[in-house]
């Protein structure tokens, strides 16, 4: 399980979406609406998640379904970013982890 500080979601789908990061105790951190071909980023440490917490990304299509990523992540103050891409249509889409980026200096 990768340890990251931030989660980036890139909308490569054909719909407006929003995304949230959810912890085991129900605590969550949500994005604003993310238009087509845009990206958003959430800093987990600024969102109130303690280090070591396991979280999962959940994507919701506007007027469509919601889908969780297959990968769980662990919160850490290490500057790393998990990058996810969303592709498909509002009723048939996938959420894919495409990279773990190192901290930028």
What does each of the following model-derived ranges do?
Residues 1-105:
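Intrinsically disordered, low-complexity segments enriched in small/polar residues
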């Amino acid at each position: 399980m990768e340890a990251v500080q931030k989660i980036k979601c890139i909308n490569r789908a054909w719909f407006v979406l929003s995304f949230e990061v959810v912890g085991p105790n129900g605590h969550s951190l949500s994005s604003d609406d993310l238009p087509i071909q845009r990206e958003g980023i959430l800093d987990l440490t600024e969102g109130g998640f303690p280090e070591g917490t396991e979280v999962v990304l959940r994507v919701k299509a506007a007027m469509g379904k919601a889908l969780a990523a297959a990968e769980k992540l662990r919160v850490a103050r290490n500057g790393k970013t998990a990058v996810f891409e969303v592709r498909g249509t509002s009723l048939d889409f996938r959420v894919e982890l495409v990279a773990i980026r190192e901290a930028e200096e």
